[in-house]
Amino acid sequence: MKRWPVFPRSLRQLVMLAFLLILLPLLVLAWQAWQSLNALSDQAALVNRTTLIDARRSEAMTNAALEMERSYRQYCVLDDPTLAKVYQSQRKRYSEMLDAHAGVLPDDKLYQALRQDLHNLAQLQCNNSGPDAAAAARLEAFASANTEMVQATRTVVFSRGQQLQREIAERGQYFGWQSLVLFLVSLVMVLLFTRMIIGPVKNIERMINRLGEGRSLGNSVSFSGPSELRSVGQRILWLSERLSWLESQRHQFLRHLSHELKTPLASMREGTELLADQVVGPLTPEQKEVVSILDSSSRNLQKLIEQLLDYNRKQADSAVELENVELAPLVETVVSAHSLPARAKMMHTDVDLKATACLAEPMLLMSVLDNLYSNAVHYGAESGNICLRSSLHGARVYIDVINTGTPIPQEERAMIFEPFFQGSHQRKGAVKGSGLGLSIARDCIRRMQGELYLVDESGQDVCFRIELPSSKNTK
């Protein structure tokens, strides 16, 4: 990630900057909407005010025109100089209102026509108690022009309302498009800052996954992003180095322990064998019993050491490569390897492989099957049955190892996969259990992207199930 001079160095600064930049377009939109709303409000108030003034003026001009005509006719009937003065006052008032109304009229010709009519009506001309013919014509023309003025005023007022509506619609459309653009800008910034924050978190997640899988992080790990996340990455790298060192120390300790234990154990085994062969002299029955106990204990100790070393070796192994494994040969090999103890206990084994293959590592899977089948033989009931079966369930293959015998107590089921745990039901045979077999088996299955667990099967005493990925050749 390229760092700019103003790039936030901490996660808090980055989050604050993200919030500010994402809110900025929304604040701009809100500010512009407020300004536009104020402008439209002022414009609407102005339109309403001018419309009211113009409408009242046009109404007043209409009334003034009627009063002028009434005063004109009254003067012709009464020939009263006072009425002449009233008429001229009304004419002057109409002229002033016409000048004020000139800006409202859409056509200057109408204004000039009214102005000319007012000029023509400046002198009162009467005949036979009424306006003469020319004056009557001028009064008629003035009334007609005044009516046209009122209609023109109404048209102008209506057009103002329509113009205001069009402007409101245009502003609404403008803000609609602007809102869409600003929303897209905000969305782009959300995605950008999400990537800037999630990217380093994903790197840390990958580092933790590699660490959990037992793979080395190496020295090529690059750290980017806020200082807090870079610090976490550095601590994870330090933790990886520390775990690697502890793992190497553990392996070294186990190698030394194995060497230090196997050497005296071999001498002990050799001594007990010499005593058992009576090389140093004949033994009494009591002495033979003691030698037998020593030999059995030394064998158990050797088996325990070998299982402990095997358990740690499998934990330290790198990730396995899965391949297509045919189940039938593995099962046949495992059953054959334990045929003698099974025959000695008169146990019957059924094999039912409906799923013929799975994805696994052959040696690890054989080791697990060998452990489970060996447990079924040695923990199973005399003259009992053992069943090895497989089935396909979606993208997973189930391999069940079932035997008759004493069921595992409910309170022990959660503990049987823990290292060194031995249940209340003891193993039958010359070699006693160490409590590591099932723990090693589960670790092996999990390294092959599978799972090993105990299930309840109707009509069966004990059933261990292996769950593994199915292969393309699985039927």
From Swiss-Prot:
Residues 1-13, 195-475 are cytoplasmic. Pfam families: HAMP, HATPase_c, HisKA. The keyword Cell membrane applies. It is a multi-pass membrane protein. The modification Phosphohistidine is found at H259. Its main location: membrane. The chain crosses the membrane at residues 14-34, 174-194. One of its GO terms (cellular component) is outer membrane-bounded periplasmic space. Disruption phenotype: Mutants show decreased amounts of glmY. One of its GO terms (molecular function) is phosphorelay sensor kinase activity. GO terms for biological process: intracellular chemical homeostasis; osmosensory signaling via phosphorelay pathway; response to epinephrine; signal transduction. Member of the two-component regulatory system GlrR/GlrK that up-regulates transcription of the glmY sRNA when cells enter the stationary growth phase. Activates GlrR by phosphorylation. Not required for the regulation of the glmY-glmZ-glmS regulatory cascade by glucosamine-6-phosphate depletion. This is Sensor histidine kinase GlrK. It comes from Escherichia coli (strain K12).
